[in-house]
Amino acid sequence: MKWDVITVTFNSSGVLESNWSWYQEWSDQFNWIVVDNASQDNTVEIAESLGARVIRSSENLGFGAGCNLGLRSSELPLVLFANPDLRIQPEDLRVLEETLERESCLVSPQLLNLDGTLQINGRGKPYLSAKLAHRGLKVFRSRLKTYLPEPAESGISEVTWIMGACVSTKRETLEKIGSWDEKYFIYYEDHDLGMRANRLGVKVLVDSRLMWRHEWARATTSLNSFAWYHEFRSAIIFYRKYPELLR
């Protein structure tokens, strides 16, 4: 057994049941650690019934801090951070393992929406102008071509960062670049991880030979004040840390 799979949950009971019911058949192949951020529903009970080892937090620590709590509670050489709404293809872990053994990197399968369309989880440099273009500001739309690159056809492509919904790496690689920055409660912590990897020469990869579905429903596509507060707060933290991206 080489893999620790770490999932951070918060009121995630519905997506756990629909995406992780397969785990018990594979429980001898890898450890599944669920860090629960003080859910108010029956997430903990469902995770335990599915075979996960559950770590209960008495408060909502946020995504990065939850990932780090799971990381400190694990010990195997390979780590996969996987959202509760991610549909893992467990047989693909062998392919990810081969990539991680070849080089120091962060790597994810290509993610798909539930309807099979591409979900571009590998992104280019997160210049502020590119982020604004992605939010619909047309004056910067020329930035989107490099920010939202087309995945390689049946191969591996190098990007700047990958969505935190699915990140695999070696434990020793995380020790080199550092774990998740807990200053971000949610949003931008995956941008930050990718930027730190880039600076240290650690590649960030998307493997389009592997395709996993992700039930992505970003809260900031609606009028959710909690989500927007943390989006703006995390953006301020991020661009203060990387002022070279303010263009």
Please give the residue ranges for each predicted region.
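Acidic helix N-cap motif at the loop->helix transition within catalytic regions
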Residues: 16-17, 41-49
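Glycine-rich, basic loop-to-helix element that forms the pyrophosphate-binding segment
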Residues: 57-74
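Short, flexible, basic/aromatic active-site loop/helix in glycosyltransferases
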Residues: 126-160
